[in-house]
Every structure is written in structure tokens, then in C-alpha cells.
């Protein structure tokens, strides 16, 4: 991953971890992954600060099993969280069990879609606000409190965007007639109009990600934190979510670790 002379073993402080996960966002609909139509300035700039993985794949093209997989490190069938809308078996260990003994405060703010609580005993869970928005006040308070107490943290920020119904953001930013649609879509006016609303919600999600990064900056925790961006499975248009076509399991994955990960690097490693 392009590590510098400052290795993990040489660090005297435990790094913080912040993982931002989108919801139903095809990786190729981000600017840094090749989209010519999307507006994702925060994610694109973030990619210049870390390593962008080109071959990051999920275990399954569904939300709940993917999140169980992410938080437990287990294949969903093994944890019990398969198919969608199921939960892990009692007794399954999650990232919370592994990090809390090391002194970490572990929190999830945003979408959950995981269960039971005994498997995911987060120190803090804050659901989305009414309308599905992230609670940025809770994000800032959690980071600020950990900083004040000198406690390392692992924070999962789970956005609801750009999951349908695609009713957030400003679709007027996008000209339906000039969009470059993926070749597998049926190119009709209705598809183009729908796609503008999807892109608008991606832009909305990008702003959410930018807000989270700004909070890290405000709390002066950027240089002490590993930040990961994931796009989750593809959108709900054909040949993506729910399928094992590439768009269904291929995720955007970008990692920033100041002083450790080489800025602007690209990795073809399979992750």
C-alpha cells in the first residue's frame, strides 16, 4: 500500500479508524473511478490523499450480509447472516469484541441493518435522523469526547445514500440528454431522467462524506486517523445490486493513512 518509513509498528499511538460506507452506489459512478457525469469532489480529492483500490469485492451483492461480513470478518453463510435481512448467530464475535479490549471506543452512526445486539455491542449507536440523514452532531460529539478522554476510536459512519427512492440532492445539476449511460441500461428518456436523480443522491452522499472529513479536521484528528471509504454494492438498476455481475459485487475502496499510505497511489490488489 505504498507505506513510508513510518510503519505501524513504529507508531507510539493507536490510530483511530473511521470507515464511511455508502449504500447502493456502483463504484463506476464515482469520478475517481471513471464517471464523466457524477459530481463527487470530496471523494475524488480524498482519493488523491490515499490509495484507491481497483479490485475491491464484496462477499455478496446484498446490504445486510455485506455489513455483517464487514463487521465480523466472516463469510455471511458462516456467521448466519445470509440471505438479506437476516442476522448473525449468537456467540459470533465482531470488530467490537476485538477492539474494546485494546482500549478503543467503537461506534456506529447511521444505517445499521445488523443484529443481534449481543454480537454488535457498540459503545454508541446513533440511528439516522428523520428522513434518513446522518447525525453529524453525534459524529462530532463522539470524536470530540474520545479526543478529550485520550481514547482511540473506531467509528463506522453508514450513509443511507444513494439508496432508492433517490429523493435527495439536486437533479437539475445533470442534463439527462447528455449523460453517458452504462451500456447494459435500456437507453430511453425514462432511464435518463431516473439516472439524474441517482447521480444527485450520489452528490448528496459526497457532501456527507465531505462533512465527516471536515469534522475530523476541526477536531485536529486527521493525522491520527485511518479513513476508509466504501461504496457498497451497486445501485438497484439492472445488472448490479442483487446480482453477481461485476457491478453487484465490485466496490469502491479508498484508504487514507497520513504518513503511512502514499498519497495518490492506486493498487490492483484483490481485497
Predicted regions and their residues:
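Formylglycine-dependent sulfatase
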Residues: 1-271
Amino acid at each position: 500500500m505504498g507505506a513510508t518509513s513510518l510503519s505501524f509498528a513504529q507508531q507510539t499511538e493507536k490510530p483511530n479508524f473511521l470507515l464511511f460506507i455508502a449504500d447502493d452506489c456502483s463504484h463506476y459512478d464515482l469520478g475517481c473511478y471513471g464517471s464523466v457525469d457524477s459530481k463527487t469532489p470530496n471523494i475524488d480529492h480524498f482519493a488523491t490523499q490515499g490509495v484507491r483500490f481497483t479490485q475491491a469485492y464484496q462477499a455478496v451483492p446484498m446490504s445486510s450480509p455485506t455489513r455483517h461480513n464487514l463487521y465480523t470478518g466472516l463469510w455471511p453463510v458462516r456467521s448466519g447472516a445470509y440471505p438479506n435481512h437476516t442476522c448473525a448467530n449468537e456467540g459470533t464475535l465482531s470488530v467490537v469484541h476485538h477492539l474494546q479490549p485494546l482500549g478503543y471506543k467503537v461506534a456506529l452512526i447511521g444505517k445499521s441493518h445488523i443484529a443481534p445486539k449481543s454480537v454488535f455491542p457498540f459503545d454508541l449507536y446513533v440511528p439516522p435522523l428523520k428522513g434518513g440523514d446522518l447525525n453529524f452532531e453525534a459524529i462530532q460529539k463522539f470524536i470530540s469526547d474520545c479526543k478529550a478522554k485520550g481514547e482511540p476510536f473506531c467509528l463506522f459512519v453508514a450513509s443511507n445514500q444513494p439508496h432508492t427512492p433517490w429523493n435527495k440532492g439536486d437533479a437539475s445539476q445533470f442534463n439527462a440528454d447528455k449523460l453517458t449511460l452504462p451500456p447494459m441500461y435500456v437507453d430511453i428518456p425514462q432511464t435518463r431522467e431516473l439516472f439524474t436523480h441517482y447521480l444527485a443522491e450520489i452528490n448528496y452522499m459526497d457532501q456527507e462524506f465531505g462533512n465527516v472529513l471536515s469534522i475530523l479536521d476541526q477536531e485536529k484528528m486527521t493525522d491520527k486517523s485511518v479513513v476508509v471509504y466504501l461504496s457498497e454494492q451497486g445501485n438497484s438498476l439492472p445488472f448490479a445490486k442483487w446480482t453477481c455481475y461485476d457491478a453487484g459485487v465490485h466496490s469502491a475502496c479508498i484508504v487514507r493513512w497520513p504518513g503511512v499510505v502514499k498519497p495518490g497511489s492506486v493498487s490492483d490488489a484483490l481485497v
